[in-house]
Swiss-Prot record:
The record's note on its domains: The SH3 domain interacts with FYB1.
Protein name per UniProt: Src kinase-associated phosphoprotein 1
InterPro entries according to UniProt: PH-like_dom_sf, PH_domain, SH3-like_dom_sf, SH3_domain, SKAP1_SH3, SKAP_fam
Region (Interaction with FYB1): 285-290
Source organism of this protein record: Rattus norvegicus
Amino acid sequence: MQAIALPEEICWLLEDAEDFLAEGLQNENLSPGAQDQRDHILRGFQQIKSRYCWDFQPQGDDLGQDGSDENLSGTHGPALASDASFWSDYQEEGIDDIIRGAQELDNVIKQGYLEKKSKDHSFFGSEWQKRWCVISRGLFLYYANEKSKQPKGTFLIKGYNVRMAPHLRKDSKKDSCFELTSQDRRSYEFTAFSPAEARDWVDQISFLLKDLSSLTIPFEEEEEEEEEDKEQEEMYNDIDGFDSARSGSQGRAMALPEPLDKEEDVYEVLPDEDDLEEDACGAHRRRVDYADYYQGLWDCHGDQPDELSFQRGDLIRILSKEYNMYGWWVGELNSIIGIVPKDYLTTAFEMEGR
């Protein structure tokens, strides 16, 4: 649906009204009735925006509007066609389930206060404005504060590149800056409260971008069916060979081996000494290949049945790196086997040269 074109003055008036309700009355001591009416009107704003495709901006894909940060001339426009598949995943949930209050979001990967660079700031306004920022479900949302009921802006992280950006500032905070850039969408610049915090934001967004680009692993059903057919064919060949041997015996009784007159020695085949280690109690046990063990860098919750969930610090045994080109390995944790994102793991043991 194309956005309905409104006169610029009406757009400004609606923006001012919404901003006053959302932020101007945020900390006011309202009666319960007035508070309910305020929330009701704000929900109406969101529903109207969703119905008429307002605030889905071609530059930045913002949902919601930070009046001091964005250019009002680009406020209203149709959603990008390239992101239609993403928004279709949330059609049943509705816009209210996507745009929630800062404390109502789920699947939060990273959140905290950042300074966001305003696209167009007033003469008296600051170029950098403090915002409560949250990464959730593939979205980057920024709020006026951590108790805000709706974001001042939202954009899709997929399709962006993230990097440290010390060139954004020339003061003492230059090493705490980072930016998200895209070829066909607007850029976003942020300043954290320390260089380490900025690097953590960059790392979290980088891993999320890799995860979004490799959500599915190609699965060739035809190859699996061919392997099953081949196994069945081999089984049938074995049975046919057994039947032909029986038919060639002309129905003779099978000759059983005669019992041994004297008992023969029975020897147990033991593994090589190189494959054994001796523990403190003197008992032998099979050697552990420490190179197969990796440690979780972050918490990872599997969204699919074949994905292995683990927490930071968990020791995971890697069974296969068959899907390495897609960014996934096959691992085992507590006797549970599943695929794990390799970028979430690090080697657990340092191997010394022998």
